[in-house]
UniProtKB/Swiss-Prot annotation:
Name under which the protein is recorded: F-box only protein 7
GO BP term (any one): positive regulation of autophagy of mitochondrion
Source organism (scientific name): Rattus norvegicus (Rat)
Compartments where located: Cytoplasm; Nucleus; Mitochondrion; Cytoplasm, Cytosol
Region annotation (Ubiquitin-like) ranges: 1-88
Matching InterPro entries: F-box-like_dom_sf, F-box_dom, Fbxo7, PI31_Prot_N
Region feature (Disordered): 1-20, 85-128, 459-522
Length: 522
């Protein structure tokens, strides 16, 4: 709870962490936190008041029992400045007035501080939470200048603390645990016995928020129309100031765990079905005991307000005006051109083109040259100075095509190449190891035997070939068993058909004689 505390024309904010603080806890926080900051010792004796006159007693009493809520102003009066005769009588009368009232009065705002109360002491106790001076006939209050200074001080502290205890006015403004005052009054007056009754009360309030007026009854704003439910079926009739000559009827039928809401209009003696929506009462209404507050019964009011109005209320109003041959009064189409262009500027080009296909009015607005100039400068950052006769839409189209083409070419350029087929006859990549010797390929002992180059690079066989500086592998290097270009094994260039003396395949001698190792006689 956040409070404002004033002592000798100085106001300071004070935060009480307890959920339901008592007067004694407030006094302890004042002694520990506030008095040292104002230059007083912790032994300073003071009285807690709401009007600088009547002291509050009873440390066990909660602040709520005195009608103190978050944001109120608490006035501290030092003991030597407190008039003694006022303490017992005012305290007793204050307790009696609080006990006689069923509900504690709410805190008055700072704008009510200057309003004099001339109805006697009984009425003044009903406004016990008001701060600043009291103009009583039997007691002299502070001067007007002191009142003005105190009001300005309180307003400045309230603005500095950033605390504004405001209740929601519409269902779309609510949070969990909050309901508008109008919904609270409707719920209490309707006497709901089921969750379906509570949901229909909420639907009726949403129709009232949209400008519909109950028809055929003299229902007040804080009560439901007459005969709104009969034999388990709910029926609500409305008129709208923008649809003179037509009326809307909502027929709500419970179907198990759902409620079907059918909207029809009556125009020129005929009835036309417009829209229907299904709602689940359990999603927005809690089961509660009779007499519970509406804040404990309803939930997700913001979601239901958006869903119900977008799917039923606004289409119903637009269709009714269309049947009555009346022009549109709301929506994007009826906005001035300036507002349309400001909205279109926030969209991308695809959304603008989609809106241009809706109707003729939006087509004209979407072809505005100023709009396309803004879109062009936003999307392309072109600093070229162009003449007033520039077709910005056509320029945007050409620039957009160029950008798409450049993106496509960039995508093709950076595409990874396909892995080459193993042993491809035409290598895709250049060979990493080119022979440095001048000998033709295939010579035994050349670089070809040291690092045989296969037709393709990157095939699975090449990865098994050890390179210079690499550790030996368990796979032997792939190399030819004989020279494919040179003579065949066992051949002799001097004596064809005879093996050379140091050949790996010596000539096999005939049976019964040794080999003839003599050189031939030339």
């Amino acid at each position: 709870m956040k409070l404002r505390v004033r002592l000798q024309k100085r106001t300071q904010p004070l935060e009480v962490p307890e959920s339901e603080p008592t007067l004694g806890q407030l006094r302890a926080h004042l002694i520990q936190d506030l008095l040292p900051t104002l230059g007083f010792s912790s032994d300073t004796r003071f009285a807690i008041t709401l009007n600088n006159k009547d002291a509050l007693t009873g440390d066990e009493e909660t602040l709520a029992s005195y009608g103190i809520v978050s944001g109120d102003l608490i006035c501290l009066v030092l003991e030597d400045e407190m008039p003694a005769p006022n303490l017992p009588s005012s305290t007793d009368s204050e307790h009696s007035s609080l006990q006689n009232n069923d509900q504690p009065p709410l805190a008055a705002t700072s704008s009510q501080a200057n309003i004099p109360d001339e109805q006697g002491s009984d009425s003044s106790h009903g406004q016990v939470t008001q701060y600043d001076a009291w103009t009583d006939d039997s007691m002299e209050g502070p001067s007007h200048s002191a009142e003005a200074v105190s009001i300005q001080d309180a307003m400045s502290v309230e603005e500095a603390s950033g605390f504004h205890p405001l209740e929601p006015m519409l269902c779309s403004e609510t949070e969990d645990g909050q309901v508008p005052h109008s919904l609270e009054a409707l719920y209490q007056s309707a006497g709901c016995s089921t969750v379906s009754d509570a949901l229909i009360v909420l639907v009726h309030l949403l129709m009232l928020e949209s400008g519909y007026i109950p028809q055929g009854t003299e229902a007040k704003a804080a009560s439901m129309p007459e005969k709104w439910k009969s034999s388990g079926v709910y029926k609500l009739q409305y008129t709208h100031p923008l649809c003179e000559g037509g009326s809307a009827v909502l027929t709500c039928v419970p179907l198990g765990k759902l409620i079907m809401i059918n909207a029809t209009i009556k125009v020129n003696g005929g009835i036309k079905n417009v829209k229907s929506v299904q709602l689940k009462p359990g999603a927005y209404v809690r089961r509660a005991e009779p007499g519970e507050s509406a804040a404990k019964v309803y939930k997700d009011l913001k979601k239901l307000s958006r869903l119900f109005k977008d799917q039923l209320v606004y289409p119903l109003l637009a269709f009714t005006r269309q049947v009555l041959n009346l022009p549109d009064v709301f929506g994007l189409v009826v906005l001035p051109l300036e507002l349309k262009l400001r909205i279109f500027r926030l969209l991308d080009v695809h959304s603008v083109l989609a809106l241009s296909a809706v109707c003729h009015d939006l087509l004209i607005a979407s072809n505005d040259p100023l709009l396309w100039r803004c879109l062009y400068l936003r999307d392309f950052r072109d600093s070229t100075i162009r003449g007033p006769d520039t077709d910005w839409k056509e320029l945007y189209r050409k620039k957009h095509i160029q950008r798409k083409e450049a993106q496509r070419m960039r995508h093709v350029m950076y595409l990874p190449s396909v892995h080459p087929i193993p042993f491809c006859p035409i290598p895709v990549y250049p060979r990493p190891y080119l022979p440095t010797t001048l000998l033709p390929p295939g010579i035994i002992g050349g670089e070809y035997d040291e690092r045989p180059i296969l037709p393709s690079v990157g095939d699975p066989v090449t990865s098994l070939i050890p390179r210079p500086g690499e550790p030996p592998s368990q796979f032997r290097p792939v190399r030819p068993r004989f020279d494919p270009v040179g003579p065949l094994p066992g051949s002799n260039s001097l004596l064809p058909g005879r093996a050379s003396p140091n050949n790996r395949f010596p000539f096999r001698p005939g049976r019964g004689r040794s080999a003839d190792n003599r050189l031939p006689y030339l």
